[in-house]
């Protein structure tokens, strides 16, 4: 029994390539015939004549060998071509009976149900918005939906049968006003197969771009389809939602949301699509990115991440906010990052919030700086799992002449835990070139048993005239047991940002969170340290954050220590920052009924 598999098309192409190689070698040998076999002597002496005769003899010998090789090559190509033709003829002869057999198998279901038993569905005709045909009941992919005529929605993709992928949705038609929506992706196979991608929205020439089509859902096993991109327009169209992953799928996530459409001339970029949910056990899909804003348009908001599976699964990451560009005198505004998706009911982490979009400064002299988008909120954790981290704030760029600074976006808040788990960390504030940097996000609250999330660090002020962002407050351990989250550090800048306060501990047990350190000040005072968090009934108060240093001005004040409650020591005060005059140290926290007071910070 032979296990050899041949591809006739590949063999035919190889035979053609071999023939071309032979022709090329033959032309090269013919061109070399005269120069190599008819050499002239360099002089009239006998030595020159002997040398010329020797090299001419070598050339003639080479031509003789080349002639034999050419004959062998021609015979080999002829044999190879005949073999390729034999394979092609055999395949054609074998395919005809099989096609007839397939038609016999498919005819009953085609007549009764309007779809074959085995085979792919037909694609919808372009420009009609026709739906893609359904795939075979047993095996086959759904057909792609046809694109829409001007102003007409794209056709939905065809559904698969038991095994196969759903067809992609058709593109929405362009419109003189609003663009038409893209078609939805077809459903994946009932047993196995991924959902089809949603079609992109059409262009809205004077209005809003078309909505992206939603991705198709999977059956029992498979990934959800990706949402279609929103169409461009004065306002960009929203991206389509991602499809749900298979009900029992473990590895593949829900489909990602589609990207929001581009916006022009003062509109707003489209919002990214929501990520698809997990089935019972898989992760949610990522949210789509917000649309880009051009010529004074704001960037679109990122899409929300999809929720994790019903029983277990992590939430999807929120989409990144779109970039906003300025017009001649007004800076652009970045879109907000999308919220992270929530985890499943039993196990899983909340999704990370999306990063805020960048705000670009105005291109003309005298214009304003851009404004970065706010970072997305972290998703909530499951009963057993942490909350998601907040997204980073967007960057605020200065104007083209560097006279006006941008504003950095605030970091997103961390997601909350539920039963057992820590709160998510707050996102870092966005940086700014010559303006105010964004503040850090607040840490998420812990579960019934779990620590609060750390506060996000304040953004950095990069050049003179900038203000460092304040650190975010640490999250509280809102349940029975757990430590408070540490406060975020204040950002660096000409004027420094203050550190965030530490979070409070759980009711029964836990230490208070430490306060965040103040930022470094270049021309202004150093930032003040954050206050330490309060302890639980058993636990120590959090230490105060150190005051920030200053290059030419006063050091920042240290944060006060947190108080203990019943059994525990008070937190130590933070040290004052170094500067032309040192900052004052923070006061120590008070002890519980059993414990010691915290030490004051050094000045």
UniProtKB/Swiss-Prot annotation:
InterPro entries cross-referenced by the UniProt entry: PE-PGRS_N, PGRS_rpt
Pfam families from the UniProt entry: PE, PGRS
Domain of life assignment: Bacteria
The keyword Repeat is assigned to this record: yes
Ranges where the PE domain occurs: 1-93
UniProt KW Repeat keyword: yes
Keywords: Repeat
Family, similarity comment: Belongs to the mycobacterial PE family. PGRS subfamily.
Protein name (database record): Uncharacterized PE-PGRS family protein PE_PGRS24
